[in-house]
Amino acid sequence: MGAKPLSEIMDPGWAQALEPVADRIRAMGDFLRAENAAGRGYLPAGENVLRAFQRPFRDVRVLIVGQDPYPTPGHPMGLSFSVAPDVSPIPRSLANIFAELHKDLGHPTPSCGDLTPWSDQGVLLLNRVLTVSPGQPASHRGKGWEAVTEQAIRALVARDEPLVAILWGRDAATLKPLLTEAEVPYIESAHPSPLSASRGFFGSRPFSRANELLDELGAEPVDWRLP
């Protein structure tokens, strides 16, 4: 993640939306370079840290908020919960998401864990914290990403466009006041992690409920099927 202008590393709409935190993003770049220099490294790879902001800002219609990237090298790829097509087995959180997808909509289990088709349809797959130290979950909480992702969501809810939010876990739930103030409908449940999925994630029907809410807003539903 180099020190380039935002307009060179993300969608122009997102560059404008995140301009108020441009200095924070640059500071996070400095932090990540220092992590590399100290031999600690970080995930995902630098070119993928801001990947969620490469799809058009104006097209976002569903926001899915997670916590932080998978801490396993080779797993995180810049979209929350998603992994590269060649990752096998997929992370257990993602397996739980696919189980709920099947139960909710009856879609067959996807052949891989790549959620790019959702992103291509305007589903913003955003972690509250955008990086992590390898093997150390939650290690970059409180380092500065929270201000960036909060600004991203503030900008989203300020648009005059249909939006539905899906909040998975306690970190994501901290965004409820922002959504409530802007009258953005949201679906809240436990995180799909094996540690918490049985406490309210399973049976929450987030995919069908999101489409029902989009329909109420006059927006096209998402085709949640994956190859």
From Swiss-Prot:
InterPro entries given in the database record: UDG_fam1 (IPR002043), Ura-DNA_Glyclase_AS (IPR018085), Uracil-DNA_glycosylase-like (IPR005122), Uracil-DNA_glycosylase-like_sf (IPR036895)
UniProt-annotated catalytic positions: D68
Keyword DNA damage attached: yes
Keyword set, alphabetical order: Cytoplasm, DNA damage, DNA repair, Hydrolase
PROSITE patterns, per database record: U_DNA_GLYCOSYLASE
The keyword Hydrolase belongs to this UniProt entry's keyword annotation: yes
Gene Ontology, cellular component aspect: cytoplasm
NCBIfam families per record: PRK05254.1-1 (NF003588), PRK05254.1-5 (NF003592), ung (TIGR00628)
Name of the molecule in the record: Uracil-DNA glycosylase
Organism: Nocardia farcinica (strain IFM 10152)
Gene designation: ung
